[in-house]
Amino acid sequence: MARSLKKGPFADDHLLKKVDEAIAKNSRKPIKTWSRRSTIFPQFVGLTFLVHNGKIFNEVYVTDDMVGHKLGEFSPTRTYHGHGKDKAKK
């Protein structure tokens, strides 16, 4: 279910502060965050985030196509090892 339009998009305050500081300093340093639930705003375009996936931090470079999505969508939490292989054959 989508978020109500009258509520507007969500982003954690501490993340917005870090983004504003990075833009003000014109910093290229990645912004480390655990906030997978935050929506990507247009001001995030061109910045690099280190998004936690529960184990490590994945580097996410934000482009125009990502605006409106969540940061967590670009840092997968599960590892796919493929479907079962035939272990009995040697």
From Swiss-Prot:
One of its GO terms (molecular function) is structural constituent of ribosome. PROSITE patterns: RIBOSOMAL_S19 (PS00323). Keywords: Ribonucleoprotein, Ribosomal protein, RNA-binding, rRNA-binding. It comes from the Bacteria. GO terms for cellular component: cytoplasm; small ribosomal subunit. One of its GO terms (biological process) is translation. Belongs to the universal ribosomal protein uS19 family. PANTHER family: RIBOSOMAL PROTEIN S19P FAMILY MEMBER, SMALL RIBOSOMAL SUBUNIT PROTEIN US19M. Protein S19 forms a complex with S13 that binds strongly to the 16S ribosomal RNA. This is Small ribosomal subunit protein uS19. The lineage of its organism: Bacteria, Bacillati, Mycoplasmatota, Mycoplasmoidales, Metamycoplasmataceae.
